[in-house]
Structures are given as structure tokens and as C-alpha cells.
Amino acid sequence: MASFKIAIIGAGSIGFTKKLFTDILSVPELRDVEFALTDLSEHNLAMIKSILDRIVEANELPTRVTATTDRRKALEGARYIISCVRVGGLEAYADDIRIPLKYGVDQCVGDTICAGGILYGQRNIPVILDFCKDIREVAEPGAKFLNYANPMAMNTWAAIEYGKVDTVGLCHGVQHGAEQIAEILGARDGELDYICSGINHQTWFVDVRLNGRKVGKDELVAAFEAHPVFSKQEKLRIDVLKRFGVYSTESNGHLSEYLPWYRKRPDEISRWIDMSDWIHGETGGYLRYSTETRNWFETEYPRFLEEAGRPLETIRRSNEHASRILEALETGRVYRGHFNVKNNGVITNLPADAIIESPGFVDRFGINMVAGITLPEACAATCISSVNVQRMSVHAAITGDIDLLKLAVLHDPLVGAICTPEEVWQMVDEMVVAQAKWLPQYAHAIDAAKERLARATVATREWKGAARREVRSIEEIRAEKEAAKLRAAG
């Protein structure tokens, strides 16, 4: 097989880049390739390159690894471009959580919709379009753009509709949900089949089969409620399953902020979440986790570099889609997964222009979606509410229309359940001003927003949220990890 080039944008996301790298190299036909890493951080690039070089050296592979802060150079001649960028980093992300809290909006993640996710999209989309321009101009003709960056639907929408690049959005929510269902049903490998369909982070297990037998709502509810862990961690998802009749792929914390019912009253939030891990609903949970992960990696880098010398065959291939898509496209070995693409009738009762997440098959001919899926009415209604917000958000990001941006936030299900229009208008002004350096399309609107804030009349409060935890120190994390090892050892 002829060699080709894979470019990873945002390769400074060190743990994820390493995972993608080892996944791809687990396929023998994909080892004689070049990985071109690019990131704004020279420091992070140097760390990840040293780790990947160590893997190549230890396993005597023909793989080449290059690293540069010059994105266009990294994309030259690339056949596949993978994006895992976080525009604004943790600094901007902290504002996505902090400012909405002043107006009563308590988010667990804030990276998909809700106030935080919408502003995240405003930061990302101009950069995504820059990526697409480079791909069109310097990548291999017909190059495929694999987007892992959130907000998934908005970024993918912009790349397809405005970037004019062959794009697929990838997420692992479906796989994680399927693992839960397999566990509660006692299914072994190969015994569970399922169809998930919807939009990213609001995808639904519309058909679940165990050894060919269809598993219904009542059986799933009983199995989840009988599970000693999931019955506590997934209370909100189980409640939605009872009412909608199907299980959501997304985590308890994620799902809680896409719906208008479970996070709107501070005194009721604790009823639906679980604090055993951030992903089950903790206020600003993913921000805390991301901050701790960054700090932990910086401290533990020497150990991570040493571990990179392990034989490749001892590293388990993850369930991320990227390596399997590349394997299917390059070798013809068919892969079935769930992908984010423009709808165009794949799901019959969602808008044609929406970015949907649904089953598809990949081979040498490309990604071929399974068409004609109809969602249960409640699932479709929930998804359509989010699609409408996504559409307005994308259009606002493209045009720099701050009034349309405010309307998008106003129509968000959770924000709309909590805030008045006056509160939304002021909140968006505050967020745009705080993040101005990452929002070039709103440069013309910043001064007016500052003037409005100077005479603001809407009262706010400094609120940490209903279920906030402080960022742990390196010493605290190390102690907890050691304690966990001792517990596991019995």
C-alpha cells in the first residue's frame, strides 16, 4: 500500500492524540504513513512528538512523525485531516461556565449547546473555516476532514455547508452507551446489536437486540434500575428512558443540560445527578476534569514517556471511529459505525440541513449512511429544538450577527427555561466582551456591548452552582490514585 499523510490539528491534546496514533498503528497496513502534528503550543507539540517518536522507535516502525506550528505546512498533501481543537483553551472555557452561572444557568459540560456550547461554537467556526480553506488549497485532492472537536454538530455543519470540504463528525457517545446496555443485559461480545439515531449528544437507541431478540423499554428500565452503579449514576437518563421509551446515548451530565426540565431549579439538581464522577452532572465538571488532566500530564510526563516504550501489541485499540474509518477506506474491510453527516433524508423526521448522527458503513467507496430511519416523536421533537439552536448559532458565527446569536441562546432549551430575554441579552453581551479576542467576527459589536453592560440593569450573582467541586491539587490526585490502586488490589 502506498504511503500517505495524516494531519492532526490540535495535536497538543496529548492523551487523545496518543490514542488516535496507537489506534491507527494497530492496523498493519497503516504503519508506513506520515503523521503531521500541528498545534499553537510548541511546548505541547514537543511533548506529544517525543511520546510518539518513542512508540515508533520501540516498535521499529516505518512511521514518520513531524510537528510544526505552521498548520498549512502540516496539511500539505494530507489525505486525512483530524481536528481535536479547543479554541480559547481552558481560559475561554472557564468563561463558558462562569458567566452563565451568574444568570442561574448551571452547566455540567457546556460544549454542545446551552450558553457555553453556543459561545464555544462562535470561537470554533471561524477557525474551522480557516482549516477548510487550507484543506481545499494544499491537502491531497479529495482529502477527508474528520472532526472530533465540539460543538460537534455546529463545527461539522460549518465545515460542510460553508467550508465545502468532505467532512464527517466523530464521537464516542454511542459506544459508551452500548457498553452500558451490554453490561446490564449480561451480553457477551457479538451478542448485542443496536441502531442509534438522532443528533450528536442526543442520539437514541431506537432498536436494541440481544441475540436477535428485540429488547423493549420495560426490560431496559428494570435492568438499569437493578444495576448497583448505573441506578445511581444515570438517574436522569433512566427517567428519560421511562418517559421517551428509548435510552439516550449521552452521559447523565451531558443530557441534563440539553433538556429544559432537570437543571432549571437549583434545589432539584441534586435529585438527578450523581457526584461519584464529574460526568454524572457536577457543575462545571468537565472544566474541572480538563484542568486536572492538564496539570496531571505536565507533572507525570516523564512516566508517560517511559510507558510509550511498550510493545504496540500490548496497547488495546480503543473504540474511537477514526482508525476504523481509515482502515475501511484504505483496505476495503467494511466498518459499521455511527457518524455525523448532513441529514439529507437519512432521518425522515429531522430537517434536511441538520447534522445528524446515525449508522453508516465504510468501505473503499466511502461512508454510506443507512437511510430512512424515523425517530420516535418525542426524540425528534427534542432533537429539532436543538437543531434550530444550532442552525441559528452557525449562521450567527458566519455573519457576526450578535442579535441572531442572542436569539440562538434565547431559544436554547435550558437557558430558555431559566432566563428572561433581558437576562439572555445581557449574558451574551458579557460573554462576547469577555471572549472578544477569540471572536473576530464580532469585533464590530464589542464597543456597543461594553456600553450596554456599563448601564446594565439586570441583577446577577456570583454563584458557584448547585454541585461544584474545587480543582484538586496534583498531590490530592496522586493520593486518590494510589488509594484506588490499593482498593483494586484488595
Curated annotation (Swiss-Prot):
Reactions performed catalytically: Hydrolysis of terminal, non-reducing alpha-D-galactose residues in alpha-D-galactosides, including galactose oligosaccharides, galactomannans and galactolipids
Cofactor note: Binds 1 Mn(2+) ion per subunit. Binds 1 NAD(+) per subunit.
Enzyme class: hydrolase
InterPro entries: GH4_Enzyme_sf (IPR053715), GlycHydrolase_4_CS (IPR019802), Glyco_hydro_4 (IPR001088), Glyco_hydro_4_C (IPR022616), Lactate_DH/Glyco_Ohase_4_C (IPR015955), NAD(P)-bd_dom_sf (IPR036291)
Domain of life: Bacteria
EC number(s) given by UniProt: 3.2.1.22
Amino acids binding NAD(+): 4-70
CDD domains given in the database record: GH4_alpha_glucosidase_galactosidase (cd05297)
NCBIfam families in alphabetical order: PRK15076.1
Protein name: Alpha-galactosidase
Gene source species: Rhizobium meliloti (strain 1021) (Ensifer meliloti)
Name of the gene: melA
